[in-house]
Each structure stands twice: as C-alpha cells, then as structure tokens.
Swiss-Prot record:
Organism: Acinetobacter baumannii (strain ATCC 17978 / DSM 105126 / CIP 53.77 / LMG 1025 / NCDC KC755 / 5377)
Intracellular or extracellular location(s): Cytoplasm
GO terms for biological process, alphabetical: one-carbon metabolic process; S-adenosylmethionine biosynthetic process
Identification of the protein by name: S-adenosylmethionine synthase
Keywords for this protein: ATP-binding, Cytoplasm, Magnesium, Metal-binding, Nucleotide-binding, One-carbon metabolism, Potassium, Transferase
Required cofactor names: Mg(2+); K(+)
C-alpha cells in the first residue's frame, strides 16, 4: 500500500453545534447510568437557534431531570448568554424520547450475561500507530490539541474575546510513513465583534498553534489560514444546526483509518457501534505498544443478537514483526470481544461518556473509569505469547 505524501485531519471544539449535540446525548447517558447501570440508551440530539430537540429510545428505571441535564451541559460548554446567540438557561427543550423496542431487547438480553447478544449488526475498526507518543496519527492528534488549547484560553480569560465555536485542520508532510513537517494549519474560531482580524491572527498563531505543535515541524513554507473568511461572530447553533453523530471521523482517527459508519455518543455499552470501536482501539494500541507491529488496524463485525463476532481481521500494513495470522490468534486468546466481555474488560458501565464527546475518543489519558481503552496492560502478555 502506497504511503501518503501529505495527510490532513480536522477537529472541532466543544462549542461546535455537532459536538454540542454529542455532549448533550452523552450527558443524558451518564445521568441515566448513575442510577441504572444496565439501562438501554440511544439518545439523539438536535440543536438549532433557541432550541434543543431530543429523540431516541431509552429503557430505564432511572428518573432523571432531562431538561436540567440539557441546560447544565449547554451552559457548561459556554453558551450561557443571549449575546452569544444561544442561552442554555432559556432555550426550549423538546423531549421526544421513547422506549426501546421489545424485539431488540429479546435479541440482546440473556440469562447468562456473557451470552448477551450484540445490539445490532455492524462493523467497527480500531487503529494505532507509532506516529505520536499516544500511538495516534499526528494530524488528528494535533488538531484535537489545538481545539483543547482554544478552549483553555477561552475559559481562563487569557484570550477573553474567544467564543465557544471553533474548528482546526492540520496537514503534515510524510516521508517513509512518518510525519516530518507541518505543511498547513487552518484554524477558525468564533470571536467577539470588537477584536480586529490582525489581533486575532497573531494571537491564534502565537498563543494557540505554536505552543501545541513541535517547533521542529514548522518550516519556511508552512501555511497558516486563520479565520480565512474574516469575521466569525455568529456561530454555534445559530450559524449551523447541530446533530448527534455527525463528527464520526473527528471522533476517531481523522480519516487515517477506516470507519464502520456507526456513531458513538448517546449509546450505552450494549451498542457495539461504540463498545466494539473502543475495544478495537484497545486491541490495536496494545499490539503496537507490544512491538508486534508499528501500525495496526483491526476490523470486527457482529450480528444482532449474537455474542461472538462474525469476523476479526487485522492489517499491519507490512510493519508486523510476526505474522498477521499469529496476531489474530493472539487477539482471540487475550481479548474477549463479545459485547459483555468488552463491557467487563473495559469497565464501560460507568457514567464517564460526556468527557469523551469532545476532542476525540482516542489518544487521551486512560484511567480506571474513563478512556480505559487507552490502557496498555496487555503488552507483556502479548510479547510473551509472540516470543518477542
């Protein structure tokens, strides 16, 4: 497979309307899981001028104040005043959530938890590479960090004219499959009307971009496109409608790896769209961290109501130190990829999903209760089994 000469990935801020929708959906999921760990949740959100619309299917014993969760989330993102075009305290909240079909439940639920079937058919991918210290592709990793930096400076008041909505796009040049220089950065950020474009561009380059991207990656021809359309005062849900699940490439690997098509936010762990994609990252990251390959993509697939994956495939892009067949064998031996096995292996029945809903689901610090799929606790077992 020919390597890319350049590669580009984008990210968006927590104040981007699609990410607002993701965070609201996951905040509702978290609130439900706090009271009912085994709830079935599929929560979709739409945000547009003055309104948040909720829809989906939820089956739970939890009794939560959905409207309060929505308002707290919107205000927490930074849309807390009408001057910003959206106010979490006064926006309309329209709730159209129903119950999950019993036909789905009968296909998923089992007497023995380990026999729990997949919540739907589908295919999911996981990926890892040695491009960065978090074993993620460089373009998406740095695009996320730029958006985190924008939010940090906005929240701290260091750049008080910043507003919540923003986007980044990063292009790296590659040689021999490794990023060697920064070709271009695009960064658009919502702002107060008083700031001049000259002030904004200087601040974005000096305070957001340069502290994040390593100095050695810049070169004389690096291009900076800062708010290239000029003014960006009208943003968030006023500028664009936001929907849950519309940033699936931002959420994963920035286009560097394939995607099965299923979104994450608003879905409980019984939905393999989410849990199996997390497991795929866990598997791929441990394979790369163990030195079995420098780059790894895994595909898993499921049938609704069936526990065992219908397929497991591995692609190491010619970087493996052992055969791909052996790696697949080790995956089957060391990782339980049944839906219940994934939930248990990664401790997924936790109210921790809202923090995944902005700045990427992968390549972030792992802990006992969040981003557990970033752990590399299978490394020694894989090394020993592979004879490395």
């Amino acid at each position: 497979m020919r390597e890319y000469a350049v590669f580009t990935s984008e990210s968006v801020s927590e104040g981007h309307p699609d990410k607002m929708a993701d965070q609201i959906s996951d905040a509702i999921l978290d609130a439900i899981l706090k009271e009912d760990p085994y709830a079935r949740v599929a929560c979709e959100t739409l945000v547009k001028t003055g309104a948040v619309v909720l829809a989906g299917e939820i089956t739970t014993t939890a009794n939560i104040d959905v409207e309060a969760v929505v308002r707290q989330t919107v205000n927490g993102i930074g849309y807390h005043h009408s001057d910003l075009g959206f106010d979490g305290s006064t926006c309309a909240v329209i709730n159209m959530i129903g119950k999950q079909s019993p036909e789905i439940a009968q296909g998923v639920d089992r007497q023995k938890p380990e026999d729990q079937g997949a919540g739907d058919q589908g295919l999911m991918f996981g990926y890892a590479s040695r491009e960065t210290d978090v074993l993620m592709p460089a373009p998406i990793s740095y695009a996320h960090r730029l958006m985190e930096r924008q939010a940090e400076l906005r929240r701290s008041g260091a750049l008080p004219w910043l507003r919540p909505d923003a986007k980044s796009q990063v292009t790296f040049a590659y040689e021999n499959g490794k990023p060697v220089r920064l070709d271009a950065v695009v960064l658009s950020t919502q702002h107060d009307p008083e700031i001049t474009q000259t002030q904004l561009k200087e601040a974005v380059i000096e305070e957001i971009i340069k502290p994040i991207i390593p100095a050695e990656m810049f070169h004389a021809a690096t291009k900076f496109h800062i708010n290239p359309t000029g003014m960006f005062v009208i943003g968030g849900p006023v500028g664009d409608c936001g929907l849950t699940g519309r940033k699936i490439i931002v959420d994963t690997y920035g286009g560097m790896a394939r995607h099965g098509g299923g979104a994450f936010s608003g879905k409980d762990p019984s939905k393999v769209d989410r849990s199996a994609a997390y497991a795929g990252r866990y598997v791929a990251k441990n394979i790369v961290a163990a030195g079995l390959a420098d780059k790894c993509e895994i595909q898993v697939s499921y049938a609704i109501g069936v526990a065992e994956p219908t397929s497991i495939s591995i692609n190491t892009f010619g970087t493996a130190k052992v055969s791909d067949e052996l790696i697949i064998q080790l995956v089957r031996e060391h990782f339980d990829l049944r839906p219940f096995g994934i939930t248990r292996m990664l401790n997924l029945i936790q109210p921790m999903y809202k923090q995944t809903a902005a700045y990427g689901h992968f390549g972030r610090e792992g802990s006992d209760t969040a981003f557990t799929w970033e752990k590399t606790d299978k490394v020694e077992a894989l090394k020993d089994a592979a004879g490395l």
